[in-house]
Amino acid sequence: DEAYAIYATIIDYKDVDNILTNNKNLAEVAAAVALDEKFAVGNYVTLGRYPQMQSGEDLTSIEWLVLARDKNKALLISQYGLDAQPYNESETNVTWEKCSLRAWLNDVFFSRAFDTSEQQAIILTTVANDKSQGYSEWNITGGSTTKDKVFLLSYAEAKMYFGLNENSNTKSCIQPTAYAIAQGVFVDGASASWWWLRSPGHEQYDAARVGADGSLYYHDVRDSSGAVRPAIWVDLDSPFFQ
Protein backbone atom coordinates (compact mmCIF):
# COMPACT_ATOMS: atom_id res chain seq x y z
CA ASP A 1 0.00 0.00 0.00
CA GLU A 2 1.01 3.69 -0.09
CA ALA A 3 2.39 3.72 3.47
CA TYR A 4 4.58 0.73 2.63
CA ALA A 5 5.82 2.43 -0.53
CA ILE A 6 6.93 5.50 1.40
CA TYR A 7 9.15 3.52 3.73
CA ALA A 8 10.39 1.24 0.97
CA THR A 9 11.98 4.27 -0.70
CA ILE A 10 13.94 5.25 2.41
CA ILE A 11 17.42 3.75 2.18
CA ASP A 12 17.91 3.28 5.94
CA TYR A 13 14.71 1.27 6.33
CA LYS A 14 15.30 -2.25 5.04
CA ASP A 15 12.73 -4.20 7.07
CA VAL A 16 9.66 -2.23 6.07
CA ASP A 17 7.16 -4.97 6.96
CA ASN A 18 8.54 -5.34 10.48
CA ILE A 19 8.64 -1.58 11.08
CA LEU A 20 5.03 -1.00 10.08
CA THR A 21 3.73 -4.15 11.79
CA ASN A 22 5.34 -3.40 15.15
CA ASN A 23 4.77 0.34 15.24
CA LYS A 24 1.10 1.13 14.76
CA ASN A 25 1.56 4.85 15.32
CA LEU A 26 4.28 5.03 12.70
CA ALA A 27 2.09 3.16 10.22
CA GLU A 28 -0.80 5.54 10.87
CA VAL A 29 1.44 8.56 10.33
CA ALA A 30 2.75 7.10 7.08
CA ALA A 31 -0.79 6.39 5.87
CA ALA A 32 -1.86 9.95 6.73
CA VAL A 33 1.08 11.38 4.80
CA ALA A 34 0.24 9.21 1.79
CA LEU A 35 -3.42 10.31 1.88
CA ASP A 36 -2.40 13.95 2.18
CA GLU A 37 -0.13 13.64 -0.85
CA LYS A 38 -2.77 11.78 -2.84
CA PHE A 39 -5.27 14.62 -2.29
CA ALA A 40 -2.84 17.43 -3.09
CA VAL A 41 -4.33 20.31 -5.09
CA GLY A 42 -4.10 19.58 -8.81
CA ASN A 43 -4.13 15.80 -8.44
CA TYR A 44 -6.81 13.50 -9.84
CA VAL A 45 -8.50 10.96 -7.56
CA THR A 46 -11.35 8.48 -7.95
CA LEU A 47 -14.47 8.29 -5.79
CA GLY A 48 -17.87 6.80 -6.57
CA ARG A 49 -19.12 5.28 -9.80
CA TYR A 50 -21.36 6.51 -12.61
CA PRO A 51 -22.26 5.36 -16.13
CA GLN A 52 -19.72 6.67 -18.63
CA MET A 53 -20.12 4.40 -21.66
CA GLN A 54 -22.62 5.29 -24.37
CA SER A 55 -24.92 2.42 -23.42
CA GLY A 56 -25.11 3.51 -19.78
CA GLU A 57 -24.79 -0.11 -18.68
CA ASP A 58 -21.48 0.41 -16.85
CA LEU A 59 -20.60 1.85 -13.46
CA THR A 60 -17.16 3.37 -13.98
CA SER A 61 -15.10 5.07 -11.27
CA ILE A 62 -15.58 8.85 -11.28
CA GLU A 63 -12.40 10.88 -11.70
CA TRP A 64 -12.16 14.10 -9.70
CA LEU A 65 -9.80 17.06 -9.79
CA VAL A 66 -8.67 18.28 -6.36
CA LEU A 67 -9.43 22.02 -6.46
CA ALA A 68 -8.67 23.07 -2.89
CA ARG A 69 -7.72 21.87 0.58
CA ASP A 70 -8.81 23.12 3.98
CA LYS A 71 -6.80 21.09 6.48
CA ASN A 72 -8.24 17.56 6.20
CA LYS A 73 -11.03 18.57 3.85
CA ALA A 74 -10.73 18.52 0.06
CA LEU A 75 -12.83 20.20 -2.63
CA LEU A 76 -13.31 17.96 -5.67
CA ILE A 77 -14.87 18.59 -9.08
CA SER A 78 -15.50 15.91 -11.68
CA GLN A 79 -12.90 15.82 -14.44
CA TYR A 80 -15.55 15.16 -17.08
CA GLY A 81 -19.10 16.25 -17.74
CA LEU A 82 -21.04 13.29 -16.34
CA ASP A 83 -24.61 13.83 -17.50
CA ALA A 84 -27.02 16.17 -19.30
CA GLN A 85 -29.58 18.08 -17.25
CA PRO A 86 -31.42 21.40 -17.49
CA TYR A 87 -30.70 23.92 -14.76
CA ASN A 88 -34.43 23.96 -14.17
CA GLU A 89 -37.17 21.90 -15.77
CA SER A 90 -39.43 24.89 -16.44
CA GLU A 91 -38.64 28.35 -17.83
CA THR A 92 -39.17 30.63 -14.87
CA ASN A 93 -37.27 32.99 -12.61
CA VAL A 94 -35.27 30.66 -10.41
CA THR A 95 -32.24 30.54 -8.13
CA TRP A 96 -29.92 27.70 -7.16
CA GLU A 97 -31.97 27.05 -4.02
CA LYS A 98 -35.11 26.18 -6.00
CA CYS A 99 -33.74 24.80 -9.27
CA SER A 100 -34.39 21.20 -10.32
CA LEU A 101 -30.69 20.56 -10.97
CA ARG A 102 -29.83 21.10 -7.31
CA ALA A 103 -32.55 18.62 -6.31
CA TRP A 104 -31.34 16.10 -8.89
CA LEU A 105 -27.71 16.33 -7.76
CA ASN A 106 -28.53 15.83 -4.09
CA ASP A 107 -31.00 13.01 -4.67
CA VAL A 108 -30.65 11.01 -7.90
CA PHE A 109 -26.96 11.62 -8.57
CA PHE A 110 -25.87 11.36 -4.92
CA SER A 111 -27.62 8.05 -4.31
CA ARG A 112 -26.57 6.58 -7.66
CA ALA A 113 -22.91 7.62 -7.62
CA PHE A 114 -21.90 6.89 -4.01
CA ASP A 115 -22.34 3.97 -1.63
CA THR A 116 -23.20 4.51 2.04
CA SER A 117 -19.63 4.82 3.28
CA GLU A 118 -18.76 7.27 0.51
CA GLN A 119 -21.88 9.32 1.23
CA GLN A 120 -20.81 9.63 4.86
CA ALA A 121 -17.41 10.97 3.76
CA ILE A 122 -19.04 13.78 1.74
CA ILE A 123 -19.52 16.94 3.79
CA LEU A 124 -22.83 18.81 3.99
CA THR A 125 -21.50 22.12 2.68
CA THR A 126 -22.78 25.63 3.29
CA VAL A 127 -23.06 27.05 -0.23
CA ALA A 128 -23.03 30.84 -0.64
CA ASN A 129 -25.27 32.33 -3.32
CA ASP A 130 -25.10 36.07 -2.68
CA LYS A 131 -24.30 38.56 -5.45
CA SER A 132 -20.56 38.30 -4.77
CA GLN A 133 -20.68 34.75 -6.14
CA GLY A 134 -22.12 35.90 -9.47
CA TYR A 135 -20.85 38.00 -12.36
CA SER A 136 -21.01 41.62 -11.20
CA GLU A 137 -22.04 43.11 -14.57
CA TRP A 138 -25.19 40.98 -14.61
CA ASN A 139 -26.10 42.03 -11.05
CA ILE A 140 -28.69 39.28 -10.53
CA THR A 141 -29.43 37.81 -7.12
CA GLY A 142 -28.30 34.25 -6.54
CA GLY A 143 -30.82 33.59 -3.79
CA SER A 144 -30.44 32.14 -0.32
CA THR A 145 -27.50 30.25 1.14
CA THR A 146 -28.03 26.49 0.86
CA LYS A 147 -26.63 23.35 2.46
CA ASP A 148 -25.69 20.72 -0.10
CA LYS A 149 -23.79 17.46 -0.32
CA VAL A 150 -23.34 18.00 -4.06
CA PHE A 151 -23.29 21.38 -5.78
CA LEU A 152 -22.00 23.29 -8.79
CA LEU A 153 -19.28 25.92 -8.73
CA SER A 154 -20.36 29.56 -8.70
CA TYR A 155 -18.95 32.08 -11.17
CA ALA A 156 -16.65 33.46 -8.45
CA GLU A 157 -15.33 29.99 -7.64
CA ALA A 158 -14.78 29.12 -11.31
CA LYS A 159 -12.92 32.39 -11.72
CA MET A 160 -10.74 31.63 -8.69
CA TYR A 161 -9.92 28.03 -9.61
CA PHE A 162 -9.89 28.19 -13.42
CA GLY A 163 -9.38 31.86 -14.25
CA LEU A 164 -12.83 32.02 -15.85
CA ASN A 165 -13.75 35.26 -17.67
CA GLU A 166 -15.38 36.32 -20.93
CA ASN A 167 -12.41 35.14 -23.00
CA SER A 168 -11.56 31.66 -24.25
CA ASN A 169 -9.73 29.65 -21.61
CA THR A 170 -8.52 26.09 -22.12
CA LYS A 171 -8.11 25.61 -18.36
CA SER A 172 -11.89 25.60 -17.88
CA CYS A 173 -12.71 23.46 -20.94
CA ILE A 174 -13.99 19.93 -20.37
CA GLN A 175 -14.91 16.80 -22.26
CA PRO A 176 -18.19 14.99 -21.60
CA THR A 177 -18.33 11.24 -21.19
CA ALA A 178 -19.85 9.11 -23.93
CA TYR A 179 -22.82 8.57 -21.62
CA ALA A 180 -23.32 12.32 -21.17
CA ILE A 181 -23.27 12.82 -24.94
CA ALA A 182 -25.83 10.04 -25.35
CA GLN A 183 -28.03 11.83 -22.81
CA GLY A 184 -27.98 14.99 -24.91
CA VAL A 185 -24.88 17.02 -24.02
CA PHE A 186 -23.96 19.36 -26.88
CA VAL A 187 -20.47 18.74 -28.26
CA ASP A 188 -18.59 21.52 -30.04
CA GLY A 189 -16.15 20.12 -32.57
CA ALA A 190 -14.31 16.98 -31.51
CA SER A 191 -15.19 16.73 -27.84
CA ALA A 192 -15.62 19.97 -25.86
CA SER A 193 -18.92 20.76 -24.13
CA TRP A 194 -20.32 23.61 -22.08
CA TRP A 195 -21.15 23.12 -18.40
CA TRP A 196 -23.45 24.71 -15.86
CA LEU A 197 -22.50 26.96 -12.94
CA ARG A 198 -24.91 27.57 -10.07
CA SER A 199 -24.86 31.38 -10.41
CA PRO A 200 -27.63 33.25 -12.24
CA GLY A 201 -27.11 34.54 -15.76
CA HIS A 202 -28.02 37.82 -17.44
CA GLU A 203 -31.64 37.46 -16.28
CA GLN A 204 -33.25 35.54 -13.44
CA TYR A 205 -34.49 32.92 -15.90
CA ASP A 206 -30.92 32.33 -17.15
CA ALA A 207 -28.05 30.51 -15.46
CA ALA A 208 -24.32 31.08 -15.87
CA ARG A 209 -22.31 28.54 -17.78
CA VAL A 210 -18.80 27.83 -19.00
CA GLY A 211 -18.75 27.66 -22.80
CA ALA A 212 -17.13 24.92 -24.85
CA ASP A 213 -14.23 27.34 -25.41
CA GLY A 214 -13.87 27.88 -21.66
CA SER A 215 -15.44 31.36 -21.58
CA LEU A 216 -18.21 32.71 -19.34
CA TYR A 217 -21.70 32.96 -20.78
CA TYR A 218 -25.31 32.22 -19.76
CA HIS A 219 -28.15 30.08 -21.02
CA ASP A 220 -31.89 29.56 -20.69
CA VAL A 221 -32.43 27.46 -17.55
CA ARG A 222 -34.51 24.90 -19.50
CA ASP A 223 -31.69 23.98 -21.87
CA SER A 224 -30.86 20.31 -21.36
CA SER A 225 -27.75 20.18 -23.57
CA GLY A 226 -25.34 21.40 -20.89
CA ALA A 227 -22.95 19.07 -19.08
CA VAL A 228 -23.20 18.55 -15.34
CA ARG A 229 -19.89 18.81 -13.51
CA PRO A 230 -20.58 18.08 -9.82
CA ALA A 231 -18.46 19.40 -6.96
CA ILE A 232 -18.15 17.98 -3.43
CA TRP A 233 -16.20 18.57 -0.23
CA VAL A 234 -14.89 15.36 1.35
CA ASP A 235 -13.68 14.70 4.90
CA LEU A 236 -10.32 12.93 4.74
CA ASP A 237 -10.68 12.00 8.43
CA SER A 238 -13.81 9.96 7.73
CA PRO A 239 -13.63 6.16 8.19
CA PHE A 240 -13.91 5.67 4.42
CA PHE A 241 -10.42 7.10 3.86
CA GLN A 242 -8.76 5.33 6.79
Where are these regions (language model features)?
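Short solvent-exposed coil/turn linkers within tandem alpha-helical repeat scaffolds
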Residues: 7-23
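Collagenous Gly-X-Y triple-helix signature in extracellular proteins
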Residues: 28-242
